Amino acid sequence: MKAKVYVMLKQGVLDPQGEAVRHALGALGFDGVEGVRQGKVIELDLAEGTTEATVKEMCEKLLANTVIESYRIEI
């Protein structure tokens, strides 16, 4: 069984990596990009029967810094 966890900085939290990507895209001639938010995708191979609640607990304890990041789970 697989699960994907999408982690992004919360709205209002500065994203210096995203800003660096936006700037680099502009330098490459992609002038239409007004903003970039960078995040991460974590793919988990889970034992059958692992619940979404267990994956949520993983996120809360380790995979996401819930003070500044939000996350979304796909199973």
Which residues make up each language-model segment?
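Long, contiguous binding/interaction regions
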Residues: 2-43, 47-50, 54-75
